[in-house]
Each structure stands twice: as structure tokens, then as C-alpha cells.
């Protein structure tokens, strides 16, 4: 959600900022803007809509080597040019961009800013107006910045320009991701490393409640008490080509095709020198010492957690509960004596999951994060991390991170099973290799997927996904993919629940996508298909080879039944992709959605 960039050096700041914002588009946004320190003061450009629209209004003739930029995803105030960042104080001395949510902004307005006329509806404008108010009391800019931050409750990543000190950028972070990048005679600010790989791969990770004074030749980190902090930069393990589409029309299609390679990469990363699965002994011991596992996640990661529960309970014979993070915070269940928590998040920055992690850390419970970003907030604050090794995922709708989560969860379950002496009954690494082969086969059948999307989804207003056992969980993910990028009202249901209410929604021509990959429930789901067909539904049956029947729409290559979810989801991803194309939707950047949900 949202993105911040900043640059100070000798190059053209405008172009670097705009390119940086383009690299942050995947995070989701509805408006964008930049501010640069020009010869005659700070110049602000901002627009509602895409960055391409912002580019059109930026004056190429304005020379500037210092600036900040922002992509906004509306939380306070409607998407508009007025509410877009950067925001300025009344005198225009201070210009600010902000990610996060200031929870007490209305109270700050009443107590400190009663005489200020506000231009926007945002909580962000309170910060920049408060800065001006604090400086007016005689404080230095740095003192005023610290005072301002101490009065704010909530999350923030801030970039601030001072027209009277044009050779520096003030930065602050609390509960919202922010990095400072290090260059040769220049420095940068970014919400994540991808934004500034164009100029540097050296970054300093900021911690909560830290402020930074960024100059062309120096970076000074301090805490809110004014004490200086030393921290060395790290090298971003990314290449600029990792975040390019290459020959693909969309990132989503590229990332779907990358899934076989991701699975093979995961196998390699989690094997020991003998080719055996081997996880960190500390993780294994912590789980074995627990009496119940609690999986906490949101969205696609939650669906991965549901499948992960099946892996752990069937392989390792340990009880597992799966909870939506946003609900867990406010309705915590009765915990067992020795709980172990697993947090699943592609970005590692999901605010709802982090809120639960803070709670469980305070309670003294051990936690593991499964994430695609090892240096992320969840990774830092949990006791242990299992990386996904999926590479950057740019499309808002998750594909390769989801199957990577399933693969890592299966490996975790198998490792615990081995430690407990449970017999798995098959070679997991071998079977995952077969999964990768099956994925390649499926990714080569795009024409068939396109035809199914056109037949069932191109013009429909709604769609239902049904499945039994683990197929139900895969159906939930398929429904989410479809609604995310095609805007079709899609819902996933357990096949046996149809007759308890949902079947009332079936009309003539209603598309129903049924999954049949599990032998023990194959006849049950076939019966459910007959029920909806009798009410006029248009069924699309996706079955596993060996379980197929006459009339099935698509047959998946055979893999071990336990790992079927990794394969069954591929056609659902592709069908959703092509449905979105047929409906002329923005596949990579669907409306109202953000890749990294960093506010609760």
C-alpha cells in the first residue's frame, strides 16, 4: 500500500523519482506525486490516476537534484489530486510524503492546530502542519521533527523537505517499511529496494521510531531521544531484470510461468548435502515442544495456511488452527499451554499479521514467519524465518508466492513428521519435482485455458467454485484470483454446503467450477455437480488424471494426491488471467487493491 521514494545527489531527481514510483506501482495506488527542491523553492506535482499522467505535468526544464515522491492508496479522504501527496504546510516551508495511518490525527488537530486551515481530507496533512507549528515555537527542525513524531499515534514512513534547508531530506519510520539507499555522492529513500535498484543495491534498514537526516554525502540515523545509531548497509539480493516483464505482456503471466522454477529452487534450498529435507534444528525443536500450531495469515496466504493445516495434521499428526489475522487480534481464541505460531505473508509487511505477532510476542510465544522477503518486519520480529525463494512478485494477485508457500509448508510438515517418527509414505522431494514437471505441462496449455475462460467467464456476472476436502481450499483461492483481477463476483464453497443455502443462487447459465483431485471425495463432488446442473448451472469440471469422467472440462496431470493443490491452482490462475483479459481489466494492477497491505 502506497510507496515512498526520495533522492538527493547531483543527478536529475525528477526522473529518478518517477522511475522509482513506477517500480512501486505493484504496491497499489490511486494517485501519485513528487516534490523537488528547485532554484526558487519546492515545486510540487501531483495527479489522480496513473504515474504516466503525472509524468505529463512534470516540467522537464525545472532543474532539481533533491526530491521526494509518493504513490497513494486512499485511507483518509477520497482519491483526488488534492488528497494526493506530497502535502505542504501553510507557509509552504515544509513538504511531506507519508505512508501509514495516524490514528490520533483528529485529536492533534483539535489540540495543536485549531487555527490552521486544512486543504485536504488526509491524516498526513496534520503531520506537515504540526511540523510548522513546532518550528514556530523556536525549535530547530530536528527538534521539531522529534516532537512532532512523539505526538503521533499510529504507523508512518515519512519523507520531509525543508525549503530553508534544501540539501537534506528528513526521514522517519514506525510500523511502516522504509529503507535508505547508499550511493556514491548521492543517497536515496525507498519503501522497498526495488524502487531504487536503478541507482544502487546498497541499503540501510530502518527500525521503528528512528529518524534519519539524509544528505548527498552522509546518512545520520538517530532515535527519538536524539542519540546517534550506527548501522551498516546490506546488499539487496535483487537484479533490475528481476522486476522487468521481459517478453511477457503482464507480470502475472510471467509469474505463473515461473512457478515450476520456484518449486525446484525451494527443493534445492531446503535439501542437505545428501538430498534430504533438512530444516533448522531450532525451528524443529520449538514446534516439537508445542502442543498446538496456530497459523495466522490474510488473503491468499490464509488459503495457503488452510492447505498447510492439512499437510501438518496428515504428515506430522499435530493439531493446527488457521486464523484470519484481522479477526484474531480482536477475538483471540483460548490458547493451549504451549502454542507455536506460524505467520504467512508474501511481503512480510502485512499490518494485520504484524499486529497479532506483537501480541503473541508480548505473551512470550514462539513464532515462525514464512515470507518472500527475509529482511521484512515480520521476519525481523519473529523468532524464526523460512524464506519462500520465489523472487520478486510484482503482480498484485499472488500466484508463485502462493504455490511457494504450499511447497514450504509441505517441507515443514515432512520435516516435523520425520522428527516424530511418522511415516510419510512417499519421497516428498521427488514428488515435488513431479509437481514442477506438471506445472510446466499446464503452463504450456494456455490456449486451452483461454478457451475455458472465454466459454465460462467472459460475460458472466458471477461464478462459484466448489470442492471437497482440500479442493475446497483451492477453490477459495481460485475464487479470490477471479474476483481480484476480473471483478467477477466469485465465491468458493464446500461441495457439501451447497444444499444448505448457496444452491438458491444457481440460475440458468451460472458457471460453477468444480475441482476433483481427491479420490476419497470424487463421487461426492460429482454428486454436487449434478445438483447444480439440475438447477441450470454451466459446470466446468477440473479433475486429476485417474479420476476423470466423461464430460470433464480439463484433466490435470497426475501428481501425488497430497500435493494436488499445487497443481490444481495453476488452471485457476490462468483462467482468471484470461477472463480478466476478455473483460479488458488491468491484470497487474486491479482497482482498489494493494500488493503490500501495510495498514490495518
From Swiss-Prot:
Which Gene Ontology molecular function entries are recorded, alphabetically?
Answer: carbohydrate derivative binding; glutamine-fructose-6-phosphate transaminase (isomerizing) activity
SUPFAM superfamilies, from UniProt?
A: N-terminal nucleophile aminohydrolases (Ntn hydrolases) (SSF56235), SIS domain (SSF53697)
Kindly give the InterPro entries that the UniProt entry links to this protein. Answer: GATase_2_dom, GFAT, GFAT_N, GlmS/AgaS_SIS, GlmS/FrlB_SIS, Ntn_hydrolases_N, SIS_dom, SIS_dom_sf
What residue range is the signal peptide? none
The EC number on file is 2.6.1.16
One GO cellular component, as annotated: cytosol
Biological process terms from the Gene Ontology for this record are:
carbohydrate metabolic process; fructose 6-phosphate metabolic process; protein N-linked glycosylation; UDP-N-acetylglucosamine metabolic process
Instruction: Identify the catalytic residues.
Output: 2, 595
Q: Where is the SIS domain?
A: 283-422, 452-590
Q: Does the keyword tRNA processing apply?
A: no
Keywords of the record: Aminotransferase, Cytoplasm, Glutamine amidotransferase, Repeat, Transferase
A Pfam family of this chain:
SIS
Glutamine amidotransferase type-2 domain spans which residues? 2-217
Reaction equations catalysed: D-fructose 6-phosphate + L-glutamine = D-glucosamine 6-phosphate + L-glutamate
User: Which EC main class describes this enzyme?
Assistant: transferase
The subcellular localization recorded is:
Cytoplasm
Record-annotated membrane-spanning stretches: none
Q: What does this gene product do?
A: Catalyzes the first step in hexosamine metabolism, converting fructose-6P into glucosamine-6P using glutamine as a nitrogen source.
Q: How does it assemble?
A: Homodimer.
What name does UniProt use for this protein? Glutamine--fructose-6-phosphate aminotransferase [isomerizing]
Q: Which organism is it from?
A: Bacillus anthracis
What is the name of the gene encoding this protein? glmS
Amino acid at each position: 500500500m502506497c510507496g515512498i521514494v526520495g533522492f538527493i545527489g547531483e543527478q536529475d531527481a525528477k526522473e529518478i523519482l518517477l522511475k522509482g514510483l513506477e517500480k512501486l506501482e505493484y504496491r497499489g495506488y490511486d494517485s501519485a506525486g513528487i516534490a523537488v527542491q528547485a532554484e526558487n523553492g519546492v515545486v510540487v506535482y501531483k495527479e489522480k490516476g496513473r504515474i504516466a499522467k503525472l509524468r505529463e505535468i512534470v516540467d522537464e526544464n525545472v532543474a532539481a537534484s533533491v526530491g521526494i515522491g509518493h504513490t497513494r492508496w486512499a485511507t483518509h479522504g477520497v482519491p483526488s489530486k488534492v488528497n494526493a501527496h506530497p502535502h505542504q504546510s501553510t507557509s509552504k516551508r515544509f513538504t511531506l510524503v507519508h505512508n501509514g495511518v495516524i490514528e490520533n490525527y483528529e485529536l492533534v488537530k483539535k489540540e495543536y492546530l485549531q487555527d490552521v486551515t486544512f486543504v485536504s481530507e488526509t491524516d498526513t496533512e496534520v503531520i506537515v502542519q504540526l511540523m510548522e507549528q513546532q518550528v514556530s515555537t523556536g525549535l530547530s527542525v530536528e527538534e521539531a521533527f522529534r516532537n512532532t513524531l512523539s505526538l503521533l499515534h499510529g504507523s508512518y514512513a515519512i519523507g520531509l523537505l525543508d525549503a530553508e534547508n534544501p540539501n537534506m531530506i528528513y526521514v522517519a519510520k514506525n510500523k511502516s517499511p522504509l529503507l535508505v539507499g547508499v550511493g556514491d555522492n548521492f543517497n536515496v529513500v525507498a519503501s522497498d529496494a526495488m524502487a531504487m535498484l536503478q541507482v544502487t543495491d546498497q541499503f540501510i534498514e530502518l527500525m521503528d521510531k528512528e529518524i534519519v537526516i539524509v544528505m548527498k554525502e552522509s546518512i545520520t540515523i538517530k532515535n527519538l531521544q536524539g542519540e546517534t545509531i550506527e548501522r551498516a548497509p546490506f546488499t539487496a539480493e535483487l537484479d533490475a531484470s528481476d522486476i522487468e516483464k521481459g517478453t511477457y505482456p503482464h507480470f502475472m503471466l510471467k509469474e505463473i510461468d515461473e512457478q515450476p522454477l520456484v518449486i525446484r529452487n525451494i527443493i534445492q534450498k531446503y535439501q542437505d548435502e545428501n538430498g534430504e529435507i533438512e530444516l533448522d534444528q531450532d525451528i524443529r525443536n520449538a514446534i516439537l515442544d508445542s502442543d498446538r500450531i496456530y497459523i495466522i495469515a490474510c488473503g491468499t496466504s490464509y488459503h495457503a495456511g488452510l492447505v498447510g493445516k492439512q499437510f501438518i495434521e496428515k504428515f506430522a499428526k499435530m493439531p493446527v488452527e488457521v486464523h484470519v489475522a484481522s479477526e484474531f487480534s480482536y477475538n483471540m481464541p483460548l490458547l493451549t499451554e504451549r502454542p507455536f505460531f506460524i505467520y504467512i505473508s508474501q511481503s512480510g509487511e502485512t499490518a494485520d499479521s504484524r499486529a497479532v505477532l506483537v501480541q503473541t510476542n508480548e505473551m512470550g510465544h514462539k513464532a515462525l514467519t514464512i515470507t518472500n522477503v527475509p529482511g521484512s518486519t515480520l521476519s525481523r520480529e519473529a523468532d524464526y524465518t523460512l524464506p519462500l525463494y520465489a523472487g520478486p512478485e510484482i503482480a498484485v494477485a499472488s500466484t508463485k508466492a502462493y504455490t511457494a508457500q504450499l511447497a514450504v509448508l509441505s517441507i515443514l510438515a515432512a520435516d516435523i513428521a520425520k522428527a516424530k517418527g511418522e511415516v510419510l509414505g512417499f519421497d516428498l522431494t521427488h514428488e515435488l519435482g513431479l509437481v514442477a514437471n506438471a506445472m510446466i505441462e499446464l503452463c504450456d496449455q494456455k490456449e486451452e485455458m483461454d478457451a475455458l475462460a472465454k466459454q465460462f467467464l467472459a460475460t458472466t456476472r458471477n461464478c462459484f467454485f466448489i470442492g471437497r476436502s482440500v479442493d475446497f481450499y483451492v477453490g477459495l483461492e481460485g475464487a479470490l484470483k477471479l474476483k481480484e483481477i476480473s471483478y467477477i463476483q466469485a465465491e468458493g464453497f464446500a461441495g457439501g454446503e451447497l444444499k444448505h443455502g448457496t444452491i438458491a443462487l444457481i440460475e440458468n447459465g451460472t458457471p460453477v467450477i468444480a475441482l476433483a483431485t481427491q479420490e476419497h471425495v470424487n463421487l461426492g463432488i460429482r454428486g454436487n455437480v449434478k445438483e447444480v446442473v439440475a438447477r441450470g448451472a454451466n459446470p466446468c469440471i477440473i479433475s486429476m488424471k485417474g479420476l476423470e469422467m466423461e464430460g470433464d472440462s480439463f484433466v490435470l496431470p497426475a501428481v501425488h494426491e497430497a500435493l494436488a493443490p499445487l497443481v490444481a491452482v495453476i488452471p485457476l490462475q490462468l483462467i482468471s488471467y484470461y477472463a480478466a483479459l476478455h473483460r479488458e481489466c488491468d491484470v497487474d494492477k486491479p482497482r482498489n487493491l494493494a500488493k503490500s497491505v501495510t495498514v490495518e
